[in-house]
Amino acid sequence: MHEVSDIKVASGVIPIQNQHPMLMAQRALTLNQIAGGRFTLGVGVTHRAVTEGMWGISWDRSVRRLSEYLDGLLPLLAGEQVNATGEMLTTRGALQIPDVRTPEVYVAALGPQMLRLTGRRTAGTITWMTGPKTLKEHIGPTMRTAAAEAGRPDGAVKVAAALPVAVTDDVTAVRSLAAEQFAMYGHLPSYRAMLDREGYAGPEDAALIGDEATVRERLDEVRTAGVDEFVAIPFDPSAEGQDRTRTCLRSLASQ
């Protein structure tokens, strides 16, 4: 980060249930200080199978939980004293981390209530397994309408869309790889809902797979669906697949 001035770094999506807003803010501010103000924090409520099955923490009322989490997190990131007492979460105090910018916060919002909360209060949403039709007709409009109704200016919120990408001539084999590698997402309710909205049978349909021309065409569909930032997840483990995919993505990024 110190050697390259134009690269940003983001956390991906960090679950909120297993760390308090004070700890999350402390980590985010420290990272942003190290990154020279180029760090973006992503948060989300993860899935019932994770919170209840792995951690023994209730997943119920997840929208309320996230709202109260932001009540504590956002002021702390801005260097402010916070005194937020909610039904599910309490955050009181302040952090003493001088000379650090407030990092942007993105939320992994897919459903309408989460998107509206995101539009009102944060920098945007990070999507996964969400195709261009759903991005254009559901994700962007729901979030941006909520932002406008909250009095926020145009461009206040952004859509960052993440999808698997593989440039290959062996489409059948790589689709099978995608179906196997990303199978779990077809069974998690939030992602399953996005796949169903798009008319996709499974995660392999959401993945951008094909030769350079095909991948460029599908990426253009995503770009014109109101996406501000695209997060490519190369997944073909072969050396040729990795090289072709990264070369294609670099050429598109430079345009």
Enumerate the predicted regions with their spans.
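Active-site-adjacent structural elements that line small-molecule/cofactor binding pockets in enzymes
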Residues: M1-Q255
